[in-house]
Amino acid sequence: MDVVILDTGCANLSSVTYAVQRLGYTPVISRDPAVVLRADKLFMPGVGTAHAAMEQLRQRELIELIKSCTQPVLGICLGMQLLATSSEESGGITTLGMIDAPVKKMTDFGLPLPHMGWNQITAQAGNHLFRGIPDGTYFYFVHGYAMPICPNTIAQTNYGEPFTAAVEKDNFFGVQFHPERSGAAGAQLMKNFLEM
């Protein structure tokens, strides 16, 4: 199986690479359209600001390439946020628009921001991405912006208020947390994605 980690220019690709390798796969890091479109599974990790990430995608001519993908794509952290229509970050920017929902600055409910550390998720019953992962399982989060609950939400987390922890639309999946840093539960989620 061809597993590709998209070289977005805005991510720590090594931790995702190692996590995929531990599951017995040999991922390729690439931004070559031929390699990306031939992939059976595509990971889209991202860290940093949405503005800088979209600029990297623009410079690398990846925006239309991502939108044209028909295989399962998993956006991780900022990679998930980029699937939204817009982000309030950097004064408001347009993002990829696969999920019809915005990403908003998290509200200060007296809890430390950014939201950093382990938190529990509640997943949609029977969703394939969360197979074998019980409700209440902890995943590792690092973010100050979040997608509100929307029709494409498949898992949510509460941090002062509920927000989208995972999203799915057609072949596009996204997780706000870092599965590659979430121990056995994160490995199970990545395995579920790779076995779709």
Swiss-Prot record:
GO terms for biological process: L-histidine biosynthetic process. The active site is at residues 77, 178, 180. One of its GO terms (cellular component) is cytoplasm. It comes from Yersinia pestis. This is Imidazole glycerol phosphate synthase subunit HisH. It holds the Pfam family GATase. Residues 2-196 form the Glutamine amidotransferase type-1 domain. Pathway: Amino-acid biosynthesis; L-histidine biosynthesis; L-histidine from 5-phospho-alpha-D-ribose 1-diphosphate: step 5/9. CDD domains: GATase1_IGP_Synthase (cd01748). It is found in: Cytoplasm. Keywords: Amino-acid biosynthesis, Cytoplasm, Glutamine amidotransferase, Histidine biosynthesis, Hydrolase, Lyase. Its EC number is 4.3.2.10, 3.5.1.2. GO terms for molecular function: glutaminase activity; imidazoleglycerol-phosphate synthase activity; lyase activity. The gene is hisH. Its main location: cytoplasm. It catalyses: 5-[(5-phospho-1-deoxy-D-ribulos-1-ylimino)methylamino]-1-(5-phospho-beta-D-ribosyl)imidazole-4-carboxamide + L-glutamine = D-erythro-1-(imidazol-4-yl)glycerol 3-phosphate + 5-amino-1-(5-phospho-beta-D-ribosyl)imidazole-4-carboxamide + L-glutamate + H(+); L-glutamine + H2O = L-glutamate + NH4(+). Heterodimer of HisH and HisF. IGPS catalyzes the conversion of PRFAR and glutamine to IGP, AICAR and glutamate. The HisH subunit catalyzes the hydrolysis of glutamine to glutamate and ammonia as part of the synthesis of IGP and AICAR. The resulting ammonia molecule is channeled to the active site of HisF. NCBIfam families: IMP_synth_hisH. SUPFAM superfamilies: Class I glutamine amidotransferase-like.
